[in-house]
Amino acid sequence: MALIDAIHAREILDSRGNPTVEVEVLLSDGQIGRAAVPSGASTGEHEAVELRDGDKGRYLGKGVQKAVDAVIDQIAPALTGFDATDQRSIDQAMIDLDGTPNKSKLGANAILGVSLAVANAAAASADLPLYKYLGGPNAHVLPVPLMNILNGGSHADSDVDIQEFMIAPIGAETFSEGLRWGVEVYHNLKSVLQAKGLSTGLGDEGGFAPNLPSNRAALDLIQEAIKNAGYIPGKDIALALDVASSEFFKDGAYQFEGKALSATEMSAYYAELVADYPLVSIEDPLDENDWEGWKTLTDAIGDKVQLVGDDLFVTNPSILQRGIDTATANSLLVKVNQIGSLTETLDAVSLAQRAGYTTITSHRSGETEDTTIADIAVATNAGQIKTGAPARSERVAKYNQLLRIEEELDDAARYAGRSAFPRFKG
């Protein structure tokens, strides 16, 4: 039994040049676990609180020294001597120490950093890769990558309202093959954009961010790139969207493509897209508080496409339960920093899967080289992962980790492929 001997934290930088928390946990057997905490650009209002310093004279107010101090001065003394394998008790001790419903005292970034670092240390102590430590012998499914290759919304400086246009290599036989297909489409998209005189500048998550006349224009460009790469849209590679609609929901209407639309009108728009394009997934199609609209949309097209609750559910089991009870949405986006601890994240995944909801392990737009979410995706047999374009090292780090896991699993590895999207009829 390895006990927690010491916990240290520091400020490091994320992929957007903003400070974030990194934590190291030292165990009595000499093993060390490390984890860095991601940060989002478009965040749900019900997410656990990311503690920032607010000192405008330092990192423009975005420093995280308060969270670092919380780890060193409060969390570390409270957890010293805990059995590192008792993850649930460790996480609960931090939640109790914080004492708020949204982790606003210590900060979700402080609690999560410790939670993930403990898991990494315990896995090292057990001489197991993290995915096997968390998932046991059943951890063998490699996720379909939802690769964000064209950016709009708050991830880019353009007139495109939808935040992420993604490709999903559903027809591949293995993860490595699916990743290769995605890379080839990504590079073909760059060539398509260049040929049309469009910008090939990159957004936060490595996708291209051209200024386009409409959201459909973005889908058309991606389909052209898929064909140019030698693949068939809908058969080999499908499309997916993250609308992030809460970002353009103002004064009771959706400010979309120059018009103020109702939830009913937005639902009709999505139904047309699903009919016209090989779409397997639409994330946050409506505002996080528009539960009535979400229910109407789910009833209308939920049998044809994956409807993903990100801002809607914020990886919170109690909010997800409301969705399950009302048959609202049919998929959960899993972001560890939305809820702020590993065990609460695993609880949300388990609840979703038991209810027949699909699950997607996800990065944030502000990322680091930490690869923990790749292991979580395999540990939970999530079937899908969102971790950006096949560009920028903080995104590629997760893909490379999944390649290593697939190689290690060898014949036991299974790629989720088309089975990850049971509602897709394409």
From Swiss-Prot:
Any Pfam family matching the protein: Enolase_C
Instruction: Check the record and name the Gene3D superfamilies matching this protein.
Output: Enolase-like C-terminal domain, Enolase-like, N-terminal domain
The pathway where this protein functions is: Carbohydrate degradation; glycolysis; pyruvate from D-glyceraldehyde 3-phosphate: step 4/5
Residues bound to (2R)-2-phosphoglycerate are: 163, 335, 364-365, 386
Q: Which GO terms describe its cellular component?
A: cell surface; extracellular region; phosphopyruvate hydratase complex
How is the cofactor bound, as the UniProt entry phrases it?
Binds a second Mg(2+) ion via substrate during catalysis.
Molecular function (GO) terms listed? magnesium ion binding; phosphopyruvate hydratase activity
Subcellular localization: Cytoplasm; Secreted; Cell surface
Annotated catalysed reactions: (2R)-2-phosphoglycerate = phosphoenolpyruvate + H2O
Which keywords does this Swiss-Prot/TrEMBL entry list? Cytoplasm, Glycolysis, Lyase, Magnesium, Metal-binding, Secreted
Q: Which GO terms describe its biological process?
A: glycolytic process
Known cofactor(s): Mg(2+)
> Which SUPFAM superfamilies does the UniProt entry name for this protein?
Enolase C-terminal domain-like, Enolase N-terminal domain-like
Q: What task does this protein carry out?
A: Catalyzes the reversible conversion of 2-phosphoglycerate (2-PG) into phosphoenolpyruvate (PEP). It is essential for the degradation of carbohydrates via glycolysis.
Alphabetical list of NCBIfam families matching this protein:
eno
The protein's name in its UniProt record: Enolase
* Organism encoding this protein: Arthrobacter sp. (strain FB24)
